Amino acid sequence: MEFLSKIVRVHIPDYLNSVPVPDSFGGFLDLTAGQWLHLFAFSGTVAAAVYMSVKPYLDKKDQKDQLVNLRIQKESSKVVNMVDIEDLGNKVCYCRCWRSKKFPLCDGSHAKHNEDTGDNVGPLVLKRKDV
């Protein structure tokens, strides 16, 4: 614990006192190359720390894109489609990407979704067994 205390009470204040921050904007012209390097390293570290701590709150759009169903029956708490097995023909394709205009049937919208997102979703294909 003494090690941590020494870092917080001695080393960090010493480092912050050594950062060459001029008193005025004109003082930046008087900095040497070594002082500029020290200032850039300090500024970069502070910028990276601020960016990493704020980044989770910046990209709300990414959180919106994580939703699977973006527009189909949003007024319902759960989307359920019942299909009578007797109504199936020889082959039917059901959408699994939630982008189909003919939902619950697939219209191939997953191809654009896969291209845009790098996903690999495809339809659920139900086919009668050949006898």
UniProtKB/Swiss-Prot annotation:
- Record-listed [2Fe-2S] cluster binding positions: C95, C97, C106, H110
List cellular component terms (GO): endoplasmic reticulum membrane; mitochondrial outer membrane
Q: Name one GO biological process term.
A: autophagy of mitochondrion
Enumerate the Gene3D superfamilies for this protein.
Answer: CDGSH iron-sulfur domain, mitoNEET-type (3.40.5.90)
Membrane topology, record value: Single-pass membrane protein
Lumenal compartment ranges equal 1-35
Topology, Cytoplasmic side: 59-131
- Give the record's keywords alphabetically: 2Fe-2S, Endoplasmic reticulum, Iron, Iron-sulfur, Membrane, Metal-binding, Transmembrane, Transmembrane helix
| Transmembrane regions listed in the UniProt entry | 36-58
Q: What is this protein called?
A: CDGSH iron-sulfur domain-containing protein 2 homolog A
